[in-house]
Amino acid sequence: MKSNVCSIHMKILCLTAFVSFFAIQIACQAMAKNVEVQAEYLQHRMFDDRFINNYNLHLFQKAHEHAGLTLHRGLTVTRAHGYTTEKGVHRDSNAVGLGPAAMIRWERPLSEKLYGDLELSGSFLIYNKAFPAQGRPWGFMWRVGPRLTWKYTKNNSFSLGYMLSHSSNGMKNKNPGHHAVGFSLGFNHNF
C-alpha cells in the first residue's frame, strides 16, 4: 500500500515538473505584449453534498489572435473553501492550488468601446493537500461564460464576466468534483 502511495506521488511530481518546465519555456520565448488579470469569487452550485466556494486569480497573456478568436496562456491561483457531506459525514475541503492555464476567447464588438466575449478556459492545478476531501492533491478547473469588455483607452480595458466552473481530477475513482458560478472582474493592459 505504501509503495502505491509513493508511486502516485512520484507520478504527480514528474507531471508537475514536466508542466512547469513547459510553461517556463513558453514564458521565456514569449514577448510580453499584454497582461490580463481576472479575479473572481465563485459560489457552489448543482451538487447537494458539496459546498465549496472558490476565490480565483488568473493571469493571462495573449499568445495568438485570428478572426475574433484569441488564445491565451497563463497561470491560475485558487483558494477553495468549504466542505463536503457524504453519507452524513461532514469533511472540511479547504485548499490552495496553483498551475498553468489556457484560455480561448471569442470577441465581437458591440459598439466602439464595448465588446461581447465568450470564454473557455482550463487550468491544471496542484493543491497543497488532497482536495476536495477524499480527493487527490491535483485536479482541473474548467470555466466557461460570457464577458463584457470596455476598452476605455487604446491599451487598457476592464471587463465583467459571469462564469460557470467545474473542478475535478478527471479520475473515475476518488473524483469528488464540484461546480461553482459567479462574477469575474478583469483588467487588461497592452504594452
Task: State where each predicted segment sits.
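Flexible, solvent-exposed loop segments that connect beta-strands
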Residues: T76-N94, K129-Q134, K172-N175
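Outer-envelope beta-barrel architecture signal
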Residues: M31-V35, E65-R73, N94, E112-L118, ...
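Short glycine/proline- and aromatic-enriched beta-strand/turn motifs that initiate or cap beta-hairpins
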Residues: I26-V77, S184-F191
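Solvent-exposed loop/turn segments connecting transmembrane beta-strands
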Residues: H44-I52, L110, F131-P137, M171-G177
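Cleavable N-terminal export/targeting peptides
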Residues: M1-K33
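Residues that define the transmembrane beta-barrel architecture of outer-membrane proteins
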Residues: K33, D49-Y55, D92-P100, R136-W142, ...
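Predominantly the C-terminal beta-signal and adjacent terminal strand-loop region
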Residues: N34, R147-F191
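Residues on the lipid-exposed face of transmembrane beta-strands in outer-membrane beta-barrel proteins
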Residues: Y55-A63, L75-V77, P100-R108, L120-F124, ...
